[in-house]
Amino acid sequence: MTTLIVIVLYLCLLLGLGFFSSRLFRGTSKDYFVASHSIGPFLLLMSVFGTTMTAFALVGSTGKSFERGIGTYGLMASISGLVHAGIFFLIGIRLWAFGKKYGYITQIQFFRARFESDRLGYLLFPILVLLVIPYLLIGIIGAGKTIEPVTAGAFSEIFTNPTAPQWLGGIPPWLTGLVVSMVVLTYVFLGGSRGAAYANTFQTIVFMIMGVVAFVYIIQGLGGLEQAGKVPARINEKGVIVQDYRFDKQARELLKNDPPKPIGKVLDSESSNLTDTQPHLSRTPVAVEFKKKNPKTGEISSFERELGIPFITFVSYFFIPLSVGMFPHLFQHWLTAKSAKAFRLTVIAHPLCIMVVWVPCVLVGAWASGVLPPGIPPPAVLSAMLNLLVGDPVLTGLLTAGVLAAIMSSLDSQFLCLGTIFTNDIVLHRAGSKKYSDKQVILIARVFIVVIVALTYALAMWAKNANVFDRIT
C-alpha cells in the first residue's frame, strides 16, 4: 500500500504542476499549439528527449532484452543517438526557421505550401495519425503492466483476476490506464504546449534520476556489478538453459542454486559450442524452448523463443530512427523553440541522455533472465525486478513513478499534436482561419484531444496483452 501511496502522490504533484503551468497560458491559439515560440534550450532538450523516451524505451527495451539479450541496445539506442541528433541539426533547425517565417504550426502546413497541394495534406493526416497511435497505445499498455506487479497484494479482496497469480490484488491495467489518461488529459487540456513542455521537463528529470537510482539498487541487490554479470541464464554442457542464482526476498540477498535450476533447452544455434555461454550477453542467435504455467488454469505449456539478434534484423533496425523526422509531436516541439540557438543543447546532449536511459534498462533485462521465470510477460520485467530486488516500498514507489514519468512525458505531446493537426489542417483549412475566434479554435482542439484520449484508452484495453517493444517494431 505504501508503494501505491507514493505513486498517487506523484500523480497529484504532476496535476499541481499542470494547474500551475495553465496559469502561464496566454490564452491564444498560438500559445496553446506552439507556446508562442518561447521555449529555451533546457526546456527544449527536456521536452524533446522526454517525448522520444516512451514506454517503448524503458518498459519495452527491458522486456526485449529479457527476451533477446543485450543486442537490444544495438537495435535502437546506439544508432538512434546519432541519427536523432543529425535530424535535429539538419532538419529541425530548418523547419523551425520556416515555421517562424511563414507561421507554420504543423508539418502538414509545411508540406502543403512546399508542394502546393491540398490533397497531399489530406493524405498526410491519416498517415500521421496512424504513425502516432501505436505509441499512444504502448504508453497506456506499458503503464498498466508496470503498476500491477508493484502493487500486488494491496487490494486482494477487490481485484481478484490478476494477469498472473503472484500479482493478486494489484491495480489492474484497465484502472492504471484510465488514471494515467485522465492525468495527462488534464494538464494538456489546460496548458497546451506550454503545459506539456513544463510537465515534460519535470518528468524527464524525474525518470532520469530515478532510472539511475533504480540501476544502482538493482546492482546492489545482485551483489555488485561484477556479480551481476554472472547472473544471466547459462547454457550447460547438455544444452540445457539453467539459472545459477535466485534472489531470496526474506534474506535480501542473491543465493546460488545448487544444483542450477533448469528453465529450458537449446533447439538450434549458429554456434557449435555453447557450453557455459550466456546467450543474453551475446548477439549470436540461439533458438530455445521454455516452459510456462498458465496463470488461470495452472497448465504447463512449452513455447519457443530466439535469443540473440540475427544480422539481417540488426541491420534493418538502422533505418527505424530516421522516422523521428516525421513525428508530428517532435515537429511541434521544434516550433516551440525561442531561437535556432536553442537547438544547440539538444543536438549535443540528446545522444548522452539516450545512453543514460537505455544502458541500464537493457542490462537489467539481461540480468532478469537469471532470476525471473522465462514465461513472465516482457512488459512486466522492469517492475518485477524492482519489486524483487528493492525492498523499501517508498523507494519502489519512487522508482515506479519514474517509469510512469517516462511514459506520460510522451503521451502528453502525442495527444496534443493530434489535436493540433486536426484543428489546423482539417477544420481551419476547410472553414478558413477567420471563421472561428481564438477561443473557439482552442475549444475545437481540446474536444478532439478528449476524443483521441478516449479512443486510445479503448484500443489499449483491446490490445492490452501486446508486447510493448513489438507493438512498435
Predicted regions: what is each one?
Residues L75-V188, Q243-K265, V286, F319-I320, ...:
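Helix-loop-helix module between adjacent transmembrane segments
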Residues S22, K64-G71, I91-A97, K145, ...:
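Membrane-water interface regions at transmembrane-helix termini and the short interhelical loops
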Residues T2, F20-S22, F56-K64, I70-G71, ...:
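Transmembrane helix-loop junctions in multi-pass membrane proteins
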Residues G40-V48, G86-F88, S117-L131, G177-V180, ...:
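Select transmembrane alpha-helical segments in multipass membrane proteins
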Residues A113-Y122, V129, P165-T176, T423-N467:
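Loop-to-transmembrane helix boundary motifs in multi-pass membrane proteins
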Residues T2-S22, A35, L43, K64-I105, ...:
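Extracellular loop-to-transmembrane helix junctions
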